[in-house]
A protein has these predicted regions:
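Core catalytic lobe of class I
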Residues: 1-228, 234-237, 248
């Protein structure tokens, strides 16, 4: 995986760097924008007017834009381009957070992913695994005995796959194994799920706030081209190392 993908990552202000992206050349934008709630130097709100000016120019017709967020920032994100907003996905984490407030409120165990597009995008259903089931009251009239139980009591109509829902259950990267390298890092498996859902192999994904480079890793793993920008020098170096290791 990833041997023939095109990777283009740069350190700097994404609003300046996106000016160099050709019009309507991006198949998907997948980004965890700064929420401006931590007070950290890297957590500074990007002006939405200017951000959407770039997004609208560079995204292809029918390209999906998936933006991570959580309340109260979620409401701001949705309202930033309501005409293009389509629906919300929920990432359900394997463990809750904010144990310091566990006696005051429920643990935080999810984040929002807001999906925007200007026309129907590629949608490759990422089927869920489940228990195969039998549709009963059908007799075996198939001469080749395909898809039927041997006792003629029913027909296998499903191999266990289920249509995905708006809730995605994926574990966080393990901080104790050194795979969690950024305070707001998203699991590579979750990013792969999104990328495979809304793009095909060989297409191009942009993450204009790539942090430690997880979206780039997910693109390499799924044979997508990647453009990534990061303002912070430390996290850019981490992203560069991770992505280079994946390309070896």
């Amino acid at each position: 995986m990833g041997a023939n993908v095109d990777i283009n990552i740069k350190q700097g202000d994404c609003l300046e760097l996106m000016k160099k992206i050709p019009d309507h050349s991006i198949d998907m934008i997948c980004c965890d924008l700064p929420y401006a709630i931590t007070g950290k130097h890297w957590d500074v709100l990007i002006p939405f007017d200017e951000l959407w000016k770039h997004y609208k120019r560079i995204i292809k017709m029918g390209g999906a834009i998936a933006l991570f967020c959580k309340q109260p920032f979620t409401s701001v994100v949705v309202q930033s381009n309501l005409p293009w907003w389509r629906y919300e996905l929920i990432w359900e984490k394997d463990k809750g957070t904010d144990f310091g407030n566990a006696n005051r409120k429920p643990l935080n165990a999810h984040e929002n992913i807001e999906v925007f597009y200007n026309a129907q995008p590629t949608y490759n259903k990422q089927m869920l695994k489940g228990k195969p089931y039998v549709k009963k009251n059908y007799r075996n009239n198939d001469e080749d005995d395909l898809n039927f139980k041997s006792d003629n009591s029913g027909i296998w109509v499903n191999n266990g796959e289920r249509t995905p829902t708006s809730v995605i259950k994926i574990a966080r990267d393990n901080i104790h194994k050194g795979t969690n390298l950024h305070p707001t890092q998203k699991p590579v498996a979750l990013l792969e799920w999104l990328i495979k859902s809304y793009t095909n192999e060989g297409e191009t994904v942009l993450d204009n706030c790539m942090g430690s480079g997880s979206t780039g890793v997910a693109c390499i793993n799924t044979n997508r081209n990647f453009i990534g920008y990061e303002l912070d020098e430390k996290y850019f170096e981490i992203a560069q190392r991770r992505i280079n290791e994946c390309l070896l």
